[in-house]
């Protein structure tokens, strides 16, 4: 299949991410007037894109290939999208998948306490029911997720900001190896259980190029690297074998780490 556009920055995510401060413009004059995407516009864009992709006169994408659309960081905006008069998916839309990207750093921006207990509670009581509910409207994939969080970094990352954003990372580890293992195994278990309520999930990323051990300010960022997470035993062996197997299969399945979707 094909995803129409990745991570459109909408009226929900723009203020939450504080985009113009997080990502400073190289050319401020050229960037002047930049702003978020409205959901009404985005929905029209997706419908137009869908019909063009399925257009038989233009080498149509066959219906056995999914058309994927990203939620714009607001998954509940899509309950009435592509619906017919009966409230079901309109017959003109076939094999459509909703992509949502869910991170603990985003949970922190939404007020999740930066504690092991806080992460577990947020994932189980916010993310899990959210995925389950939206799966009644579309097949849902969690197209990006990882174990990264501020506790593992030893500092508040203010929503996943790094030295590249001007944030100063911890200069020394604040957790022992065993404490890190316990932290990450816990958030892995709760997230894997939550994502299993959807139709698939993809770890971001398989491999980082940054040397997080020998480069100052990057403590905790190795949690983005699936290979390092597996090597350091950060996935719980006590989880459902199918969930662990699905995640570990990513080593041979591709760069994001795919949980297969029927």
Model regions: which residues?
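Substrate-binding cleft of secreted/luminal carbohydrate-active enzymes
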Residues: 102, 125-129, 133-242
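Active-site region of glycoside hydrolase catalytic domains
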Residues: 1-153, 193-203, 212
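Feature targets compositionally biased, intrinsically disordered low-complexity regions
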Residues: 34, 58, 219, 253-256
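Fungal extracellular Ser/Thr-rich, low-complexity intrinsically disordered regions
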Residues: 232, 236-262
């Amino acid at each position: 299949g094909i995803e129409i556009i990745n991570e459109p920055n909408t009226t929900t995510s723009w203020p939450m991410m504080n985009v113009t401060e997080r990502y400073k413009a190289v050319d401020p004059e050229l960037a002047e007037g930049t702003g978020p995407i409205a959901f009404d516009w985005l929905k029209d864009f997706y419908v137009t894109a869908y019909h063009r992709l399925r257009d038989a006169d233009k080498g149509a994408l066959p219906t056995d290939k999914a058309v994927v659309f990203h939620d714009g960081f607001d998954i509940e905006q899509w309950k009435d999208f592509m619906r017919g008069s009966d409230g079901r998916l309109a017959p003109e839309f076939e094999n459509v998948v909703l992509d949502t990207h869910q991170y603990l750093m985003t949970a922190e921006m939404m007020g999740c306490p930066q504690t092991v207990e806080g992460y577990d509670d947020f994932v189980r009581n916010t993310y899990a029911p959210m995925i389950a509910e939206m799966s009644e409207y579309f097949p849902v994939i969690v197209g990006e997720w990882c174990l990264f969080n501020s506790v593992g970094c030893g500092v508040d990352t203010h929503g996943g900001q790094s030295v590249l954003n001007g944030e100063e990372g911890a200069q020394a580890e604040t957790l022992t190896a065993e404490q890190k293992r316990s932290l990450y195994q816990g958030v892995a278990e709760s997230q894997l259980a939550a994502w299993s309520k959807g139709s698939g999930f993809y770890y971001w990323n398989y491999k980082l190029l940054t040397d997080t051990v020998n480069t100052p300010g990057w403590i905790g960022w190795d949690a983005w690297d699936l290979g390092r997470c597996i090597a350091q035993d950060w996935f719980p062996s006590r989880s459902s074998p199918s969930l662990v197997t699905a995640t570990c299969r990513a080593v041979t399945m591709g760069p994001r780490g795919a949980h297969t979707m029927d």
